[in-house]
Swiss-Prot record:
InterPro entries: BipD-like_sf, IpaD/BipD/SipD
Domain of life: Bacteria
Keyword Transport: no
Induction per the UniProt record: Transcriptionally regulated by SicA and InvF. Also regulated by InvE.
Domain commentary: The N-terminal domain is an intra-molecular chaperone that prevents premature oligomerization of the residues on the coiled-coil region that are involved in interactions with the needle and/or itself. The residues in the C-terminal domain probably form oligomeric structures at the tip of the needle that are responsible for the regulation of secretion of other effectors.
Keyword Secreted: yes
Spans annotated as Disordered: 1-26
Encoding gene per record: sipD
Subcellular location: Secreted
Record-stated family: Belongs to the invasin protein D family.
Stretches of the chain forming a coiled coil according to its record: 295-322
Name of the protein this chain belongs to: Cell invasion protein SipD
Keywords, alphabetical: Coiled coil, Secreted, Virulence
General function of this protein: Required for translocation of effector proteins via the type III secretion system SPI-1, which is essential for an efficient bacterial internalization. Probably acts by modulating the secretion of SipA, SipB, and SipC.
Length: 343
């Protein structure tokens, strides 16, 4: 670049002005290097290819077995985090979009915002927005949907599945706790063992820890909490009673509904005192009346799990549909970039 300060006009007519002075070693002359269009397209291809790979991995986790363990949830969370990182790279590189692609992404990632429960407002597109800003908006929103919506449901279903499995383990012992009475008109039920196991399960899920909290989703050490407003919002979304909203530390959490178990224990107490052998003998009519109430509470627990599983499935489908829109857009952009280099 021409440095005008290195030229000096001659004070005498007819004398040629001095030539530019050579910069000293201590001086630095900056030269802007503008990457060629080919180099830019090559960078786009790398970024788009990486994003396409991460999208495929995310789709595989969405199609796998529903999350019922911490390991499954961790795998899904990692896939979502890697997808978000690859989208951030697209935003930084400014991969260009066609007008149709721009509108498709704006439409897809703006529509679901009102249905989500995000701790922070999701990015909203302006009337005029650059391609880089579109990618940034998509990255922010898919991260919020994954962590604050789908991620919550994954945790809810995992915790509730473990809870119901523990209850099912108690049911599996019922055959050994039920014996015939003195004649064909009575039965003997080991109410002490049944009550003890039910109380143990109630006490376990009355404790607030990473294995018992439905919302917020837990990870790492300690217990994460939310504001009361956020917790109440999810309490309503999960259709759980107020007893599931609990204050903990500086915030609030939503826990498993223990009402059915507590009603079971109450009904057992209503049967009367057991004998010295911990069993209670009753006529068939009394037993059948108790059994009917017990099964009704069991059905309530089963219905709650089925409802939460369906809500999780809906959240999974919403996220999957957004990922499909992304996959189509990125595949199209990748083909365009490759065609430019080949053409």
């Amino acid at each position: 670049m021409l440095n005008i300060q290195n030229y000096s006009a001659s004070p005498h007519p007819g004398i040629v002005a001095e030539r530019p002075q050579t910069p000293s070693a201590s001086e630095h002359v900056e030269t802007a290097v503008v990457p060629s269009t080919t180099e830019h397209r090559g960078t786009d291809i790398i970024s788009l290819s990486q994003a396409a790979t991460k999208i495929h991995q995310a789709q595989q986790t969405l199609q796998s077995t529903p999350p019922i363990s911490e390991e499954n949830n961790d795998e899904r969370t990692l896939a979502r985090q890697q997808l978000t990182s690859s989208l951030n790279a697209l935003a930084k590189s400014g991969v260009s979009l066609s007008a149709e692609q721009n509108e498709n992404l704006r439409s897809a990632f703006s529509a679901p915002t009102s249905a989500l429960f995000s701790a922070s407002p999701m990015a909203q597109p302006r009337t005029t927005i650059s391609d880089a800003e579109i990618w940034d908006m998509v990255s922010q929103n898919i991260s919020a949907i994954g962590d604050s919506y789908l991620g919550v449901y994954e945790n809810v279903v995992a915790v509730y599945t473990d809870f119901y499995q523990a209850f099912s383990d108690i049911l599996s012992k019922m055959g050994g706790w039920l014996l015939p009475g003195k004649d064909g008109n009575t039965v003997k039920l080991d109410v002490t063992s049944l009550k003890n196991d039910l109380n143990s399960l109630v006490n376990k899920y009355n404790q607030i820890n990473s294995n018992t909290v439905l919302f917020p989703a837990q990870s790492g050490s300690g217990v994460k909490v939310a504001t009361e407003a956020e917790a109440r919002q999810w309490l309503s979304e999960l259709n759980l009673p107020n007893s599931c909203l609990k204050s903990y530390g500086s915030g609030y959490v939503v826990t498993v509904d223990l009402t059915p178990l507590q009603k079971m224990v109450q009904d057992i107490d209503g049967l009367g005192a057991p004998g010295k052998d911990s069993k209670l003998e009753m006529d068939n009519a009394k037993y059948q009346a108790w059994q009917s109430g017990f099964k009704a509470q069991e059905e309530n627990m089963k219905t709650t799990l089925q409802t939460l599983t369906q809500k999780y499935s809906n959240a999974n489908s919403l996220y999957d549909n957004l990922v499909k829109v992304l996959s189509s857009t990125i595949s199209s952009s990748l083909e365009t970039a490759k065609s430019f280099l080949q053409g």
